[in-house]
Amino acid sequence: MTTAQFAVNLNMEGLKGDLLVFCVNQAKERGKIVCHNLVDAQVRAAFDLGDFSGKEGETLLLYPFHSTELSVAGAARILVLGVGDSSDQKEPGGVRDLFRRAGGCIAGQCELLKVETLMVALPETPFLDPGQTAECLVEGICLGDYRFVRYKQPESKEREYLGLKQVFLVSGKTDPAVEKGMDLGRRAALAACEARNMANEPANIWTASAFAAFAQTLAKAHSLGCRILEKSDMERLGMGGILAVNQGSGEPPKLVVLEYLPENRSETLLLVGKGVTFDSGGISLKPAPGMEKMKYDMCGGAAVLCAMQAVAEERPHVGVVAIVPATDNLSGGLAVKPGDVIRHFNGKTAEIVNTDAEGRMILADALAWGINEYNPCCVVDLATLTGAVVMGLGHHYSGIMGNNDALARCLEDAGEKAGEPLWRLPLGKAYAKQIESKVADIKNIGGKSAGAITAAAYLENFVGDTPWVHMDIAGTAWDFTEKTYIPKDGPSGIGVRTLVSLIRNWQPGTIVSSR
């Protein structure tokens, strides 16, 4: 994760660094291309020769002669980066992601060139204000600068370059919004990178107890409330779903709670994230190929806790509570079996038809308990819940389902702003019928069809009339659509920035408890 220090400079005077970046739009008509005359002349020559067009991701690397004017701001190198034509983007979210991808591309070039001190001339666009451009660019740089090398030897090639140390945004004019945008982008990106760190940890390290320890550390650093419910608490409260999934494990379960509850809060949002630290499928065992990636089954839990990192720093007017039911799902002599019946926190009974449909079982208890305990204005849950959502939406969209149109729209808007697109799927009585059980109130799978929707239908039994949206990130938590700021192999940190965007833009009274 990047440890770079960020700063905004009015101009390039006195700056020195390994790389200076100018972003160039792919426009049909051109005035001045970049702000420095000699660099502008060189770029124009490249345009005229057809060597550079400004299309997205295209690069032109210049090496200034330090005895001439081309020695811009003491830069060892100058990178001219094409960002495409922002006028081609149909939605504001598309322009935001264009500059986020530009930031990711810059980070990639910095890795190739082993850059430690980076200077970026803040690009101008009529579609975003300078603060928004700074936010997206910095977000992309931070996210693109991510690497996880904790378990590599010090002499390994992966440790030859450990990322950026200093980043200067050169704004060209005094604008407090630029510094604010830079801070917003940095905070959201660092929170997402922390979620990537959690997911990258092996399951023998990142256990339910590790979730609890992270929450306690974050709470202490930022004066948040923290509660850890132990196995004995769950037994007393009747959280049969979490306890059943944990039966085959040697690690005790935890219900991890982080609270940001300012005295002047108008409303409280509840975030719930699936925290299955390793999912073997239990008795309904998963196939061996690719099972090592099931350490990523806790990405929903990572997202809600790491979103709280940004919340703690920004201190919004709305209260936020994050809950992670944490356990692994293993087979063993005591493991829950297909055909078993359990009783959830709210008293509903469930027949376990498939032990690999465990995520909904632990989320059910967390949702019901969280609503009962905090009386939130609305609930959002995140989970790597079903393979069915991958079959339906691939790795491009996360699926959402819920009982409240206004909340769903707010979440869709937040996802668009964050570059994490969402696609709403239906819910209704026809899908609820698929999970009816002959021996219990409900069963934990609903057959081969509409698997993502029937999983949400299971969860709907535990939210009552509270406005609620479920976000299935099974297709996007890793192997997400390739972007310059998303690792090609490994966890994406999806969901964190969507939640942060939702909270930043929250308007009290928007969501009412009606459908």
Swiss-Prot record:
It is found in: Cytoplasm. The keyword Manganese applies. Its main location: cytoplasm. One of its GO terms (molecular function) is manganese ion binding. GO terms for biological process: proteolysis. Keywords: Aminopeptidase, Cytoplasm, Hydrolase, Manganese, Metal-binding, Protease. InterPro entries: Leucine_aapep/pepB, Macro_dom-like, Peptidase_M17_C, Peptidase_M17_leu_NH2_pept, Peptidase_M17_N. NCBIfam families: PRK00913.1-2. Belongs to the peptidase M17 family. This is Probable cytosol aminopeptidase. It comes from Desulforapulum autotrophicum (strain ATCC 43914 / DSM 3382 / VKM B-1955 / HRM2).
